[in-house]
Amino acid sequence: MAKTSSTTKDAQDLFHAIWSAYSATPTNLKIIDLYVVFAVFTALLQDVYMALVGPFPFNSFLSGVLSCVGTAVLAVCLRIQVNKENKEFKDLGPERAFADFVLCNLVLHLVIMNFLG
């Protein structure tokens, strides 16, 4: 029984350490994180809908899911580039990173619209 309570306490300490470290994250990165969570949640919601209703217009389903996943991946790339603590992108300004994000999203959605037919 002591081992279980020790494991629970370790898990709680770990969660508290992660939460306190994330609390120090700048607000703009938290907004990007929220956007990523929303995109992934939307993709999961589309998966559940397809499982319940059926995949009749399968290219539409694939377009929707790939749009959500692609947007989430591009947002993660934006988060990496905008993060001040990241040493690899020190000389890349946030405006340039956002412009890259917008341009890549435009290309992604043009490809997805082409895939729809």
From Swiss-Prot:
Lumenal side: 55-57
Chief location: endoplasmic reticulum
A Pfam family hit: DAD
Localization of this protein: Endoplasmic reticulum membrane
The protein's name: Dolichyl-diphosphooligosaccharide--protein glycosyltransferase subunit DAD1
GO CC terms in record: oligosaccharyltransferase complex
Subunit structure: Component of the oligosaccharyltransferase (OST) complex.
Cytoplasmic side stretches: 1-33, 79-96
Entry annotated with the keyword Metal-binding: no
Gene Ontology process terms (BP): protein N-linked glycosylation
Statement: the UniProt record of this protein carries the keyword Acetylation: no
Top-rank lineage group of the source organism: Eukaryota
Protein function: Subunit of the oligosaccharyl transferase (OST) complex that catalyzes the initial transfer of a defined glycan (Glc(3)Man(9)GlcNAc(2) in eukaryotes) from the lipid carrier dolichol-pyrophosphate to an asparagine residue within an Asn-X-Ser/Thr consensus motif in nascent polypeptide chains, the first step in protein N-glycosylation. N-glycosylation occurs cotranslationally and the complex associates with the Sec61 complex at the channel-forming translocon complex that mediates protein translocation across the endoplasmic reticulum (ER). All subunits are required for a maximal enzyme activity.
Keyword entries, A-Z: Apoptosis, Endoplasmic reticulum, Membrane, Transmembrane, Transmembrane helix
Family indicated by similarity: Belongs to the DAD/OST2 family.
Membrane topology field: Multi-pass membrane protein
Pathway in which the depicted protein is active: Protein modification; protein glycosylation
Transmembrane segments: 34-54, 58-78, 97-117
